[in-house]
Amino acid sequence: MITTVIIAIVCFAVGGGLSYMLFRYGLKSKYDIIIKEAQTEAEVIKKNKLLEVKEKFLNKKADLEKEVALRNQKIQQAENKLKQRELMLNQKQEEVQRKRTEAEAIKENLEAQIVIIDKKKDELDKLQMQEREKLEALSGLSAEEAKERLIESLKEEAKTQAASYINDIMDDAKLTANKEAKRIVIQSIQRVATETAIENSVTVFHIESDEIKGRIIGREGRNIRALEAATGVEIVVDDTPEAIVLSAFDPVRREIARLALHQLVTDGRIHPARIEEVVAKVRKQVEEEIIETGKRTTIDLGIHGLHPELIRIIGKMKYRSSYGQNLLQHARETANLCAVMASELGLNPKKAKRAGLLHDIGKVPDEEPELPHALLGMKIAEKYKEKPDICNAIGAHHDETEMTSLLAPIVQVCDAISGARPGARREIVEAYIKRLNDLEQLAMSYPGVTKTYAIQAGRELRVIVGADKIDDKQTESLSGEIAKKIQDEMTYPGQVKITVIRETRAVSFAK
């Protein structure tokens, strides 16, 4: 038993020792393997790093070589440029030297020629002096006296030639200007077509039956008095069947009265309170219609940027007239004529059209200041920030201020064309006859005038002068003086042509 135990203990001890030895041997082997692997990996890393460093070195070397090559190339190019420049400078230097040599040769040649010329000049002066002495001896005049006589004769000849030349130029300019002006005016008129509108100072309001007249008059005339007080229009109710006459010089008031009457008659309620209500409503409608008319007019004409108050004034032109011609129609016609004429003359047609539309705005305000309508219109345009050339065209279209823009004469001419065309305006017969008589009497006031005739509705004045009192040259100045006096002292539409006629008659009798 004990032996068995001892054997077991010995076996255990031997087994433990063997196990320990085997364990130590295994650890050493594994350590050796790890060391070998580490050494191998270190060798690989070392080789990789060496390769990487070598690659970087080679790349850096290649980059440096490229940079050096590029710099060498630039240096070579710079050297080539310097060589070329040096070559060019050498060539230029040679050229300068050559030209300097040529210049010196030319200078020497010129100096030699100057010496020759000076000698010849001295000889010529001597010859001239000898010839002058001979001429003075032959003519009996000194050189200064002969020179003065020659200059005087040349002056007279030059004056005669200049006068003839000026007359030719003036005749040609008059002929050309006349033809061109006629062409432009005719073309402008042909390209503008407008209606003829004749306004009256009365409006006839038609009613269905005469029974309505009594309702309009009201008890003891209270309705008609209320209507007249509200509108400012005289209402004439007479025996004219189915008609009531509205009389007022202000077309806006007449239009308000007409529309108010139409609404009252249609509604059937006619009494003072209702009349005031309807008139106030209609007045507002008419004001809106005025603004709408102004806007529509500017849109039709292609005019933009006008002040709202100017648009209102343009709309109000619809209810104004001048010598029976509707003012808005006249303004539109003048605007279109201005645009056409400005285009023909190479000016801005839009600005000309704007000036033509606004030229009569001074006739619109209800108050009547002391200023003429052209100057008042100019002040209104300036107030609402219109450009200076537009304002000048408005103010100068009746020569009441100096024309400082090219638009002014265009507006003046187109205004005259629009107002002077047949059927455009209507004048009172007495005023028409008086104007003709005034024209004839004005011309008769000049000495030497024997007869005068106003023809073509006062657009031409023929003046007969005595041949023994006025010569041909004086006829031209007389026509100019008469034209200026008519322009300064008279008011007339369009233009007046003055023709002075001088006739010489020789009468003999054979017996």
Curated annotation (Swiss-Prot):
State the InterPro entries in the record. HD/PDEase_dom (IPR003607), HD_domain (IPR006674), HDIG_dom (IPR006675), KH_dom (IPR004087), KH_dom_type_1 (IPR004088), KH_dom_type_1_sf (IPR036612), Ribonuclease_Y (IPR017705), RNase_Y_N (IPR022711)
Keyword Acyltransferase attributed: no
Please give the positions of the paired cysteines in each disulfide bond.
none
Cross-referenced SMART domains? HDc, KH
Task: List, for all copies, the residue spans of the domain called HD.
Answer: 327-420
Function in brief? Endoribonuclease that initiates mRNA decay.
Q: Can you tell me which family this protein belongs to? A: Belongs to the RNase Y family.
PANTHER family (UniProt xref): RIBONUCLEASE Y
Q: Per its record, how is this protein called by name?
A: Ribonuclease Y
Its ancestry begins with: Bacteria, Pseudomonadati, Bacteroidota, Bacteroidia, Bacteroidales
Q: Which gene encodes it?
A: rny
